[in-house]
Amino acid sequence: MFARAVLKLLAAVLALECTGCVLHLQRDLEPPPGFHYEPPPGATQPFDSFERTPVELSQPFDETRNHEIMRFEFRSSGRNGHPDNLVEGQYFRSKAPGKKSLVVVMPIWGTSSYPPAKISTGYARRAGDDTHVMWIYGNAPVFPWTELSSVPTEEGFRALAQDSAERYRSAVVDMRRLVDWATMQPEIDASRIAFVGFSMSALVTATLLANEPRVSAGVLMMGAARFSEIFSRCRNRAGEVREHVLRTFGWTPSEYHDFFESLFAPADPVRFEGRYDPNRILMIDAMFDDCMPESARAALWEITGHPQRVTFLYQHRSAFYSLTPLGLNVSRRKIYRFLDKVLGRDAAAGD
């Protein structure tokens, strides 16, 4: 009996250790002193102007009980890295009549499609016919890390980095164009449009929220502010780029920081303090993030007025396990509940 009890205790301890990725802190605090929110009157340069563009929808290629599933595409406003300069994705369009809310799920460009696929299909299933979902594909990277970390000349590096800044600008403007199209569709409730961003697309979503007043809410998972700090301190692929530039071209860390500050300051959330409604934002980050510095994550939280913030006790990539059964789907459930709340689905939502 005693031996069996000890084995059960050991099993329980091991189970707890194996679910470390779901250990997290949650903050629900008042806005910082002096914080004042005013809805953004419009977009600022270089995100302020664009031409309306049609979004082309395919015939449905699949369906669920509540949604038709079709592909969509439209031409990018700039150079977005796609071979044909297109924005592509899937549209889970509700079969029910009447105006429904819209959730746009952003990609992790050039890397894993699991997080956006999981949230897109999962929330469409959860919301039923009360919500449309659009999943943006991310096959073309905003930052071509392999090329950036191996380009042989300083001139070539500067050109690639400037092209990446243009891809970022295009991503923000293209999502503004998508929102513009969505507000004119008879099946979409223009007052209930939310975005979900992960890592790099969390940065884009943060810029978008400050420049597109028709986006009513956003999820920022593994994002931050102070973009030049991210480039200066992120490890992973971005760290390989930094090491290459400092070693090959003889740049100092300060020169590297200032170069990316000049490129990305127009998009940085620090520029848009007061344009974020903390009641309409969910921030998810990782305490031991090895890409987004703690100071940059704290800055985003301050600038956005102390929105609901969930901090997982993990590093950058491993925090995404919280979207999976390995992480007990903790962040997935938190995202769903947040969307239910801001889109007015509380009464009808399950877990």
Residue ranges and their predicted role:
Residues 298-351:
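C-terminal catalytic histidine-bearing segment of alpha/beta-hydrolase fold enzymes
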Residues 207-255, 311:
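Hydrolase active-site cap/lid region
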Residues 117-119, 279, 292-302:
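Short alpha-helix in the alpha/beta-hydrolase fold that links the catalytic acid
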